[in-house]
């Protein structure tokens, strides 16, 4: 493992220590109440079984204040090893797969330099059979270089990046990781695996992402799918499993050559639990996000497997297909089951049939110790302040006093995002709702919470000076599409709040029965104002915005004026701090320090 630099985080901790004393907080931390008597549905094992993780985004130490998802990756390792033991006992196959986005979202992954060093190393302690890349491995050149140089080699060809290349130290383009992998399972199933990223265009300039449709027509891919020694095609991709053309193209390219060979798909990126049908011998699974979910899928009826038929699951019947029309129909339908496992110790114990005393493995215990040591190394126990109540991301209306978006527009943006040389100039501050990735919960607020709320260290607040107000006042309505209420269900109040999943096989996929949580759409655009009130009309104002939004802000203003008033040459950074900690996530840390540093008992 490459030694991580934690200089920047240690410096920030020192900075805050100078602003105000380091805060000690009670060890009786707030946690979500959870009823362990909830009914947990058992898993059904087929001849071939899969455990799936995706979009972990650094949450490998678990959700420390939410008992529903509190298991760390050490406990997950014990779960995997116990499940491997069960698979051997049942004499069936079990594969462990992951579909990318290993960081951006938690202090454990984001407080190192480059990001992801610690979490990548934790991943190497798990016996993954196949992994693939996500878009968050490519935003920063330092991250993609480190992943390519140190993380990929550990997997000996089982980490896949079928449509991603990288410029090496000689400035020559080479494959980021293996294009494909071929192996035979314990029970004789010959598997060809590929791993694709969706048609991503936001990568740093040291990498190249080939569109899936182009890759499908490439020589190497055509050679692989025309092999005759394949019993199952395993398609991994950082691509949502529903309504995405990338999967349809990949599925069709194989089905046209192999009308009857099973195709198993695992997706990611959209952060949901989902299961979608492609045809009678091809289904797909997406296992959630943030170490909240472990995906489970079993296949039975595989003629190529020498494992005993388990007679579980159900066949594909009249479900709507995600595939392109007019493809060959397989004549060997398979039987499938799926589950979405809550990421906690109780559920892991239940599914491995272990007691509290027998569940942990020595390897899992050791990994939990390593995770704790990494947290200590990164100073993740530091506290900026203690939040007095919950501020929610999606559980309440964005206009509610309990909304993180209202806190942001009413307080954080106008009070923290300032410029000492233009503090008296009226301004609007524009941010994007998608930059907020979680809620702010009552209790201590430290590095973990900061990155969980907003992990985007490359987002800075820029501005255009002295923009005519007649144009600036129209920006919000031009850029923002609004939000809509969805998924309200208040009729199951006796159950724990959590995931209530509906997919192509129905509503019985969650391993634990929950009551649905109200969910409001995230606003596209957030806007705050400072230096003037709603009834005044200054002639000109400063327009402050995230660099992420620069192109659409410039385009909108120029369209309103029917002229090219502004180009990138007119844009400069607005929020600038002498210490350099002035990207968007730090706005919350400074606000909590300013408002609630004396709020911890």
Curated annotation (Swiss-Prot):
<dbReference type="Pfam" id="PF00149">
    <property type="entry name" value="Metallophos"/>
</dbReference>
<keyword id="KW-0539">Nucleus</keyword>
<protein>
    <recommendedName>
        <fullName>Uncharacterized protein PB2B2.06c</fullName>
    </recommendedName>
</protein>
<dbReference type="GO" id="GO:0046085">
    <property type="term" value="P:adenosine metabolic process"/>
</dbReference>
<keyword id="KW-0963">Cytoplasm</keyword>
<feature type="signal peptide">
    <location>
        <begin position="1"/>
        <end position="24"/>
    </location>
</feature>
<dbReference type="GO" id="GO:0005829">
    <property type="term" value="C:cytosol"/>
</dbReference>
<dbReference type="InterPro" id="IPR053828">
    <property type="entry name" value="Nucleosidase_C"/>
</dbReference>
<dbReference type="InterPro" id="IPR036907">
    <property type="entry name" value="5'-Nucleotdase_C_sf"/>
</dbReference>
<dbReference type="InterPro" id="IPR041823">
    <property type="entry name" value="YHR202W_N"/>
</dbReference>
<dbReference type="InterPro" id="IPR006179">
    <property type="entry name" value="5_nucleotidase/apyrase"/>
</dbReference>
<dbReference type="GO" id="GO:0009166">
    <property type="term" value="P:nucleotide catabolic process"/>
</dbReference>
<dbReference type="GO" id="GO:0005634">
    <property type="term" value="C:nucleus"/>
</dbReference>
<dbReference type="GO" id="GO:0005576">
    <property type="term" value="C:extracellular region"/>
</dbReference>
<dbReference type="InterPro" id="IPR004843">
    <property type="entry name" value="Calcineurin-like_PHP_ApaH"/>
</dbReference>
<dbReference type="Pfam" id="PF21953">
    <property type="entry name" value="NadN_nucleosid_C"/>
</dbReference>
<dbReference type="InterPro" id="IPR014485">
    <property type="entry name" value="Pesterase_C1039"/>
</dbReference>
<keyword id="KW-0732">Signal</keyword>
<dbReference type="InterPro" id="IPR029052">
    <property type="entry name" value="Metallo-depent_PP-like"/>
</dbReference>
<dbReference type="GO" id="GO:0034655">
    <property type="term" value="P:nucleobase-containing compound catabolic process"/>
</dbReference>
<dbReference type="GO" id="GO:0008253">
    <property type="term" value="F:5'-nucleotidase activity"/>
</dbReference>
